[in-house]
């Protein structure tokens, strides 16, 4: 960002900021269940259970994404949840679904939900990842590792272990893998968990987009995760880019240079982190011992720069998305104002003269608490005591920690702390001795298992999605296939079977619509959103649309009858001849007479 706006801001706060104080034209608690011919969008208000329709010239789909959940044994058990469910229950319902968690997926979502679970009081036993290396932003991974949560790469989840009455889970079977395929003989059991948090990626929720393109054509646009999975800033930029594109299509005067700038920023915001530095930059030894300073453990270039607005003395700069922040230690006075303003918690303050650390913290800790000082891998470097917690407005606080047995330049190795009683024990995995097979469900809406699909496929190496839908009902439940079809494609591809074609989005695209609601008992009021300043609303005795021979004649006789009609017409042509008498010659005397009388009436 060139000026501080959305960087470091939480997603829901970005939405509130963009919506503004005037909420006109924003309908909350409403879901689109279909897009009808004639560019009519069908909507239902979930609070009032009323159905209404919106007529529009342009459509922008910003429906976000849905979680992708791979198929594994017993994945229908209570205790197996996607990150979306875990987050919603924590953030909206203030409810923890479990206390001991296994997170599947070492990406940004896995890091974020694991971190939030820890904040809420849960214990994340481990994070497993099928890739040989971690994904996501490295600063997010460091934030989780500093809590001593182990991240196990090249591991996959094979099975959830149910309790005695199948009302929950007690463990999981995991295995080492290569190219996401489990290696036989490496299966092990992780016991003592009650929730499996599935964070294996997102897929665009694009069913409305597919149908919108069929109805609106080139006037259908998409923004945010509905078109490409990305961060909040990326969604904001794509929304602005879409708005400019629509304005240009409408013929409005816009700055094309602004459009190019936004487009470039949107592309830059999607880049993967690129490693620039091997180790963080530090001041000279003499400067370290002279006064306090900060260390920025941000080694990768990517689209994030709230830190460049954080220093009141202008000591932090970042020239582009492909560079890392730079600290001018001649300007840095060690005020640590920047420490709490980094969204990735990658800035740390030090005062070697007093053995003091200034560390970002986003969970409750008591002052005078004895803690373990840790590095980015959660390894214990020593002990310290929390002297003071400096509370900040963005809820990222700063803990002033006095190091007890780490001194001098060794302090700069410290990146965080863990309360001694919360430091986890080493992970204990048991070998898998006897396995009880369980069902692998592909479609949770209609309880379609992988075996059900394989029976239909037989010995073939391909099958159409339509045949699967017709024979198994997979993809015909409330989710309309947006979750189960991607799961099925992944599961069958591992067995050398390809699915041909894509499912056609079918209404209702929301499972919250009842058949009786399509014929409402009474007609509601009509609302017009004031997107234009040149429209007016008037009451008429009769409205005639079209000024051709039929329309103008109807206008004449209604006027003669005292109905006070109003006629609207888009262009000239027949109307010019029939209403205004604009043509000097008419093919029939009757037309000339109609034109004469109509002209007099007008």
Write out the residue ranges for each language-model feature.
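N-terminal Rossmann-like FAD-binding beta1-loop-alpha1 element of flavoenzymes
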Residues: 113-118, 538-567
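Glycine-rich FAD pyrophosphate-binding loop
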Residues: 1, 126-134, 559-576
């Amino acid at each position: 960002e060139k000026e501080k706006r959305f960087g470091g801001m939480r997603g829901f706060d970005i939405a509130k900021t963009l919506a503004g104080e005037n909420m006109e034209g924003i309908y909350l608690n409403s879901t689109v269940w279909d897009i009808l011919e004639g560019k009519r969008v069908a909507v239902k208000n979930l609070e009032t259970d009323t159905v209404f329709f919106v007529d529009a010239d342009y459509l922008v789909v910003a429906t976000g994404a849905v979680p992708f959940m791979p198929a594994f044994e017993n994945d229908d058990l209570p205790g197996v949840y996607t990150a979306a469910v875990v987050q919603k229950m924590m953030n909206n319902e203030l409810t923890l679904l479990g206390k001991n968690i296994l997170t599947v997926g070492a990406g940004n979502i896995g890091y974020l939900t694991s971190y939030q679970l820890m904040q809420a009081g849960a214990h994340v036993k481990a994070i497993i990842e099928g890739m040989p290396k971690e994904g996501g932003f490295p600063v997010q991974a460091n934030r989780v590792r500093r809590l001593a949560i182990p991240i196990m790469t090249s591991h996959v989840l094979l099975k959830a272990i149910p309790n005695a009455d199948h009302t929950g889970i007690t463990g999981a079977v995991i295995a080492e893998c290569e190219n996401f395929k489990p290696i036989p003989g490496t299966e092990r059991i992780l016991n003592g968990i009650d929730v499996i948090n599935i964070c294996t990626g997102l897929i665009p929720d694009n069913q409305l987009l597919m149908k919108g393109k069929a109805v609106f054509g080139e006037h259908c646009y998409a923004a945010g995760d509905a078109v490409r999975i990305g961060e909040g800033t990326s969604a904001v930029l794509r929304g602005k880019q879409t708005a400019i594109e629509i304005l240009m299509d409408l013929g409005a005067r816009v700055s094309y240079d602004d459009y190019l700038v936004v487009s470039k920023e949107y592309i830059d915001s999607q880049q993967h982190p690129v490693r620039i530095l091997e180790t963080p930059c530090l001041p000279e030894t003499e400067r370290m011992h002279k006064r306090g300073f900060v260390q920025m453990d941000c080694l990768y270039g990517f689209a994030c720069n709230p830190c460049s607005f954080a220093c009141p003395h202008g000591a932090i700069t970042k020239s582009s998305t492909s560079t890392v922040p730079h600290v001018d230690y001649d300007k840095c006075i060690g005020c640590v104002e920047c420490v709490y303003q980094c969204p990735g918690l990658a800035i740390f303050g030090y005062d070697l003269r007093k053995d003091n650390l200034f560390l970002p913290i986003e969970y409750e800790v008591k002052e005078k608490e004895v803690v373990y000082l840790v590095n980015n891998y959660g390894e214990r470097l020593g002990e310290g005591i929390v002297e003071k917690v400096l509370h900040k407005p963005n809820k990222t606080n700063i803990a002033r920690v006095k190091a007890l047995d780490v001194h001098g330049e060794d302090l700069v190795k410290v990146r965080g702390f863990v309360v001694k009683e919360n430091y986890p024990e080493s992970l204990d995995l048991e070998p898998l001795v006897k396995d009880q097979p369980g069902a692998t469900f592909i479609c949770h809406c209609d309880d379609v298992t992988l075996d059900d699909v394989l029976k239909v496929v037989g010995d073939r190496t391909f099958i159409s999605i339509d045949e699967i839908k017709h024979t198994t009902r997979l993809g015909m439940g409330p989710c309309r296939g947006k979750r189960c079809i991607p799961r099925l494609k992944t599961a069958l591809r591992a067995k050398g079977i390809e699915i041909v074609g894509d499912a056609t989005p079918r209404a209702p695209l929301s499972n919250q619509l009842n058949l009786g609601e399509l014929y409402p008992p009474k007609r509601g009021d009509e609302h017009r959103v004031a997107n234009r300043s040149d429209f007016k609303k008037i009451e008429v005795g009769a409205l005639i649309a079209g000024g051709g021979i039929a329309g103008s004649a109807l206008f004449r006789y209604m006027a003669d009858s005292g109905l006070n009609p109003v006629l609207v017409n888009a262009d000239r042509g027949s109307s010019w001849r029939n209403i205004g008498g604009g043509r000097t010659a008419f093919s029939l005397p009757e037309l000339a007479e109609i034109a004469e009388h109509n002209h007099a009436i007008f």
